[in-house]
Amino acid sequence: MKKAILIALTLLAALPVPLADAAEPVNLLISGGRENNGFHIALTADGRDYAIVSTVSLEVGGNLCEHPEEVPTELLCTAPEIAGFEVNSGGGADSVFFTSDIPVPVTIRGGGGNDKLYGGGASDKVVGGPGDDLLFGRRGDDWILGGPGRDRLSGGPGNDQLRGGPDKDKLSGGPGQNQLIP
C-alpha cells in the first residue's frame, strides 16, 4: 500500500472562527513519512497559487489546497492565504526544493538520511538531520543548521547564519554579511 503524505494547515494565531471563515493567512505544514520523499514547491506563473509536486500521494486537510485534475501527487494551494511553509521531510533520502521566487518564509527540517534541502526567496530556516545533507538557504537572510554527518551548508545571497554539526561540515555563506560557525 502506498503511503500518503499529510498536508495540514496550522494557523499562525488561535482564531475564534472556523478555518473556512478565517481572514488571516496560515502556515502550510508538509510532513513526510519514513520513505524517500521528494517535494517541489513553486509559485504558478500568474502568482495566484503555489504548486506542490511530490513523489508520493498527497492527502490534504483544510480547504486551501486541491488536487488539480485528480492527480494524487500534485496540489494547488491559494497563495494569498499562505503566510509560510513548514516541511518536516521525515526519514529517508529526501529532496525538498522551493523555487527562489517563493516570497514567504520557509522552514525545512530534514530527518535521518542524506537529504537535499533548498529554501526559497525569503528568510528561511533549513535544518539537517542525521546523514550527509546538502542544505541551501538561497536568497534572503537564512538560518541553516547541520546535523550529525558530513553536511554542506550554503547560504546564498543575504546575511546568513550557518552552523555546522558535530562532524566535518563545509560552510559557504555567499554574498552578504554571514556568520559561519563550523
Identify the residue ranges that each predicted region occupies.
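Secretory targeting and sorting signals
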Residues: M1-A22
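Short hydrophobic transmembrane-like helices used for membrane targeting/insertion
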Residues: V17, V126-V127, I144
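Glycine-centered beta-turn/loop sites at beta-strand termini
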Residues: G32, N88-S89, F98, I108-G110, ...
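Intrinsic low-complexity/IDR segments
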Residues: P18, Q179-I181
